[in-house]
Amino acid sequence: RMPDGSKIPYWNTFYQKVFYDPIDAQDLLKQFGMQYASAEELADLVNKQLKENVNPADMNLGRWANMHNEICDYLDSRCKYLGQMDLNLKSPLVWDFYKNTLQKLAGYGAAIIRLDAFAYAPKAPGSHNFMNEPETWNTLERVRELAAPYGLTLLPEIHASYEEKTYEKVANYGYLTYDFFLPGLLIDAIEQKDGTTLAGWANELIEKHIVTVNMLGCHDGIPLLDLRGLLPEERIAGLIDLIVARGGFVKNLHGQKNVYYQVNATYYSALGEDDRKMLVARAIQLFMPGKPQVWYLDLFAGKNDHEAVAKAGEGGHKEINRTNLTIEQIHSALT
């Protein structure tokens, strides 16, 4: 809903959840001039259905059915959105916003700027939702031109399977590349007691002069879709089963059980909460080609936070690896 009251839908790539605030009799008195007893009864009727997640358009308002449109408009005017809004790349205002944001980040001392889910940015009706070419590269180059005066290096976050070779394209265009293969390869190597594939990947990075930022745990899950082409499907499935057995959660795409994306778990828990395995994994990461990125929770051997997931409710699976540690917990983990 825009400031002028008009409701304009936007193309949202990831998710969208709408929250409707409950109303009370005083709201209805002011808005519609109702009698208090009627307003109280209608407010109770509306709030009961909101609590049951009934969409306002589908509400049964009983003897106030003639007010249905007015009530819907009123609820819409007070709703809140949870989601990620897509920006219109054709608007000069968006590019002004990008420039100002890059300038501000540079002013804070930033050197590397992660471009989250970047390959979704230049989508268009009738085209793919992800990684349109050459639009993706043209857009990325335009952002690089904005970043250059501030001495900023760009890190495009683009998830794709190994067999698609997108990581090579990113590197060939002169950008830092996220090494999303390392987290899964390390767990596989440790659990299988076989570092052949991991060593092969390290050699490829060196031979092809691919400059990466790598990681173990992160604010999202452990990427497994990316491993296609590096590991056989049965090895990937085995990794999923192992991490889930150790308390992780699988994020399925589009409700299809076999179309996996990430397993959500702390890296420490994914390794069976084994100190030696975690230390070996971190040591290998630090000596792998690339710039190591360390997720704060891994520093303190963070375990799967199932309580946080339960509190977050539906869609809260990522909270398993986002625990806010107290000073006492930090001191305890360091001793």
Language model features by range: what are they?
Residues 1-335:
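Active-site and adjacent substrate-binding regions of carbohydrate-active enzymes
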